[in-house]
Amino acid sequence: MVGKLITFEGPDGAGKTSALEAVVARLQKEVSQEIVVTREPGGNPISEQIRQIILDVKNTAMDDRTEALLYAAARRQHIVEKIQPALAADKLVICDRFVDSSIAYQGAGRGIGEEAVAQMNLFATDGLTPDLTLYLDVPSEVGLARIKQHRQNQYDRLDQEKLAFHQKVRQSYLKLAQAHPDRIKTIDASQPLEAVVTQCLQVIAQANLHLFEV
């Protein structure tokens, strides 16, 4: 048996991480597989160190391609060290962000090119693709307002980008969802958290992942 990989995606302020945590808490009561929860960039010591470099607000001189390459490097180490071993052990891996984030943020947001970033990550992942992606969608204005309200001036380097950047990111996500409807399922994240969580669980249950079989 081989485990399954579910990823959560969404623009900043979509409430993605809160939804993921609530979904995992429910799934742990309902599925027999061991669940491994992880995040990107990060998930292991090397990738967490790269994360600090990427998000450090002092690194204003970082080149856009450098940023994209750092994400890809962190992802590669994460896959080799954590994701692949978990999948090989028939575990359910739930990851906060994956390749779609790089395509949206660096490919579209930074303007490097979505296809260029996709190819870069094809090399980094060796073709590993999520079995299911939950895309939590929220208008950019709403997302940024939530960030301002909840993070109390504790912004990382990407949070500080202007509205136009975040709008490009969202449009790229929507395009990805349209291009990969079997894998990427869109959730309206402007709803209350409990409604978002319920919808996420429904999508997971309807996906042909065999998670709830005895």
UniProtKB/Swiss-Prot annotation:
Record carries keyword Transmembrane: no
Any one GO molecular-function label of the UniProt entry: dTMP kinase activity
Alphabetized Pfam families for the sequence: Thymidylate_kin
Family indicated by similarity: Belongs to the thymidylate kinase family.
Entry annotated with the keyword Transferase: yes
Entry-linked Gene3D superfamilies: P-loop containing nucleotide triphosphate hydrolases (3.40.50.300)
Gene Ontology biological-process annotations: dTDP biosynthetic process; dTTP biosynthetic process; dUDP biosynthetic process
Name under which the protein is recorded: Thymidylate kinase
Residue numbers binding ATP: G10, P11, D12, G13, A14, G15, K16, T17
InterPro entries on file: P-loop_NTPase (IPR027417), Thymidylate_kin-like_dom (IPR039430), Thymidylate_kin_CS (IPR018095), Thymidylate_kinase (IPR018094)
Native organism: Latilactobacillus sakei subsp. sakei (strain 23K) (Lactobacillus sakei subsp. sakei)
Keywords: ATP-binding, Kinase, Nucleotide biosynthesis, Nucleotide-binding, Transferase
Catalytic activity: dTMP + ATP = dTDP + ADP
GO cellular component: cytosol
